[in-house]
């Protein structure tokens, strides 16, 4: 008979259960013990069994595995198109998001396709970080039986263009896998390359894969993949909405111009969740277009008809609505230098590092101003890239605001040789769009930045500057749900008096005890600069206690500096208070990421 603990004890285990637990955990490292503690707490909080049942896809793996690693949705849409192509060719395929892929099964893959974007300065998209780290670790297996192909999406205005695709391609080859097709590195205008690549992949696989049975085809097409939420409006077919409110939420003295925008979605049926982003199709500044045309001896030719996306438009309208004018790239600099034959520009092009820095710091119009020449409309358009929408983290919950969507916009303002310049999208939203004006928008769903399913789960939110936006949505949702879980916000900006975004709302949440803790970092209010990562370290013991209680951690904001510094702070906290070395702490954080307890929305 099992001996039960006395009724007065607080121990919820019998002596026999306790003995079994001690036996099972006696040889575990501090990292393993800490992970198990948080793992089972999270399972209890979510109301899920400790060991999930095997998935249907795992039980009957398809010959073709297609992994989508997306940051802004482009890679996911392209992967869905390829999935549909393969199904139409009666080939058996499983499409899976990188964040859901059980990467330790990669050695069993025979045919592997990866479509991936790159974020920031060459980093993998958030949902692919765990897979990326695994493949580049000592644990990665040899892959002699795997054939693969990689399509990499990127933005050539960044130095490490399409780096994640390049990294996946080279690493898979190093591990012994064989290329089905040469890697493709595609810029923002990737559609033509993608169509060619998709067709080539399908043709190659037809000779390698048996035709799928009707049941297999139905399984592949029935949504046994992680589809994004359906929406009546898309990037390609956006909603025409109206601006309801535009309000500056920094003070007159602030060096930052941050706007709170409310957009009316009445009768549109457009739905979103906290964690999603709003895509905005902006228009270029007419004054900037006039300046550029004048420098290129095209003044007075704004009405000249030009072909754009299957239609004919006046040149000025084409530049306003269809071409990127505010972000320069090394390719544009090189192309213009070849037209201009300017010695100074050609010298810049000859130096790769100097070229990258010049493109980053010099808008197109200011490059032209350095060496103005006469160009035809055709030559000008041949240099430019298509305009792409900007994404903004949504700052509202529909449970609170109904048929509206709110965003927080940091307006980009600077000077070049004394001439004021603004960001393309932020300037459009702040300066050229009036209340009740129309704008084209769509929802970019982000299943990799979601509140816990269990309202009892505590959350830690780290978002300096405009990175605070999604956490406004989070707390609106938690309030509407009556969620009892604790909430802790880390926020930072230069000055308390000038830059405390949504201050009154946070104060109300603190007063009403919805916001359990708030830790603030004002970088310019004292001699020593203080940032959110410093507050995380200062509160390390409490942060670790929350993590041990199953807290989910969310980070939003700048990918290149803040997010890296915050991650280093979290690793330091885990190492110190979890009694681990830095490598173990980093692995522990990776496990949290896999469990969806550490999520980032960085840009």
Curated annotation (Swiss-Prot):
Oxidoreductase recorded as keyword: yes
Keyword Electron transport: yes
Domain FAD-binding FR-type: 236-452
Co-factor binding comment: Binds 1 FAD per subunit. Binds 1 FMN per subunit.
Keywords for the protein's UniProt record, in alphabetical order: Amino-acid biosynthesis, Cysteine biosynthesis, Electron transport, FAD, Flavoprotein, FMN, NADP, Oxidoreductase, Transport
Binding site for FAD: 326, 360, 390-393, 408-410, 414, 423-426, 603
Entry EC number(s): 1.8.1.2
Sequence positions that bind NADP(+): 523-524, 529-533, 565
Pfam families: FAD_binding_1, Flavodoxin_1, NAD_binding_1
Cofactor dependency: FAD; FMN
Class of enzymatic activity (EC top level): oxidoreductase
CDD domains attached to this UniProt entry: SiR
Sections of the chain in a coiled coil: none
Catalytic activity as recorded in UniProt: hydrogen sulfide + 3 NADP(+) + 3 H2O = sulfite + 3 NADPH + 4 H(+)
GO cellular component, one term: cytosol
One Gene Ontology term from the biological process aspect of the record: hydrogen sulfide biosynthetic process
Binding site for FMN: 70-75, 117-120, 153-162
Domain called Flavodoxin-like: residue spans: 64-202
Transmembrane segments annotated in the record for this chain: none
Protein name in UniProt: Sulfite reductase [NADPH] flavoprotein alpha-component
Natural source organism: Sodalis glossinidius (strain morsitans)
Protein's gene: cysJ
């Amino acid at each position: 008979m099992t001996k039960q603990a006395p009724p007065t004890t607080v121990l919820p285990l019998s002596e026999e259960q306790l003995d079994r637990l001690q036996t099972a955990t006696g040889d575990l490292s501090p990292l393993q013990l800490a992970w198990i503690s948080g793992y089972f707490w999270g399972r209890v909080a979510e109301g899920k069994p400790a060991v999930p049942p095997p998935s249907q896809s795992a039980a009957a793996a398809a010959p073709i595995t297609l992994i989508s690693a997306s940051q802004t949705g482009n890679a996911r849409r392209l992967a869905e198109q390829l999935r549909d192509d393969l199904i139409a060719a009666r080939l058996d395929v499983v499409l899976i998001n990188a964040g859901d892929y059980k990467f330790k099964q990669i050695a069993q893959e025979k045919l592997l396709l990866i479509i991936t974007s790159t974020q920031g300065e060459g980093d993998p998209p958030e949902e692919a970080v765990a897979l990326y780290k695994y493949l580049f670790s000592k644990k990665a297996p040899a892959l002699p039986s795997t054939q693969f192909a990689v399509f990499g999406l990127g933005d050539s205005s960044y130095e490490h263009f399409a780096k994640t695709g390049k990294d996946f391609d080279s690493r898979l080859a190093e591990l012994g896998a064989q290329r089905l097709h040469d890697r493709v590195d595609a810029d923002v205008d990737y559609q033509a390359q993608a169509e060619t690549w998709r067709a080539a992949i399908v043709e190659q696989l037809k000779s390698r894969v048996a035709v799928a049975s009707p049941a297999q085809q139905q399984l592949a097409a029935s949504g046994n993949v992680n589809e994004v939420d359906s929406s009546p409006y898309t990037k390609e077919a956006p909603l025409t909405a109206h601006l309801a409110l535009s309000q500056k939420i920094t003070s007159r003295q602030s060096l930052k111009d941050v706007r709170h925008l409310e957009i009316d979605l009445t009768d549109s049926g457009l739905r979103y969740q906290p964690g999603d982003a709003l895509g905005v199709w902006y228009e270029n500044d007419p004054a900037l277009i006039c300046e550029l045309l004048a420098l290129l001896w095209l003044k007075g030719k704004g009405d000249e008809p030009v072909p754009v996306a299957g239609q004919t438009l006046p040149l000025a309208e084409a530049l306003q609505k269809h071409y990127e004018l505010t972000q320069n790239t090394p390719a544009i600099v090189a192309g213009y230098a070849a037209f201009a034959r300017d010695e100074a520009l050609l010298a810049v092009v000859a130096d790769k590092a100097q070229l990258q820095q010049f493109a980053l710091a010099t808008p197109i119009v200011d490059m032209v101003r350095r060496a103005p020449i006469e160009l035809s409309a055709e030559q000008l358009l041949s240099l430019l890239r298509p305009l792409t929408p900007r994404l903004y983290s949504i700052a509202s919950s529909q449970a609170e605001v109904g048929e509206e969507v709110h965003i927080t916009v940091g307006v980009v303002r600077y000077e070049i040789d004394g001439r004021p310049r603004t960001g393309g999208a932020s300037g459009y939203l702040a300066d050229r769009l009036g209340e009740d004006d129309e704008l084209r928008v769509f929802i970019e769903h982000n299943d990799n930045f979601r509140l816990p399913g269990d309202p009892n789960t505590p959350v830690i939110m780290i978002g300096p500057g405009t990175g605070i936006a999604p956490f406004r949505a989070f707390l609106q949702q938690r309030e509407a749900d009556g969620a009892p879980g604790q909430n802790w916000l880390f926020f930072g900006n230069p000055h308390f008096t000038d830059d405390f975004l949504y201050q009154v709302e946070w104060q109300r949440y603190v007063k009403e005890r919805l916001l359990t803790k708030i830790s603030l970092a004002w970088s310019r209010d004292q001699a020593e600069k203080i940032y959110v990562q410093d507050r995380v370290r200062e509160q390390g013991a409490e942060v670790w206690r929350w993590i041990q209680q199953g807290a989910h951690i969310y980070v939003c904001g700048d990918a290149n500096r803040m997010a890296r510094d915050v991650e280093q702070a979290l690793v330091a906290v885990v190492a110190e208070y979890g009694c681990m070395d830095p490598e173990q702490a980093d692995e522990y954080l990776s496990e949290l990421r896999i469990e969806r307890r550490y999520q980032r929305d960085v840009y």
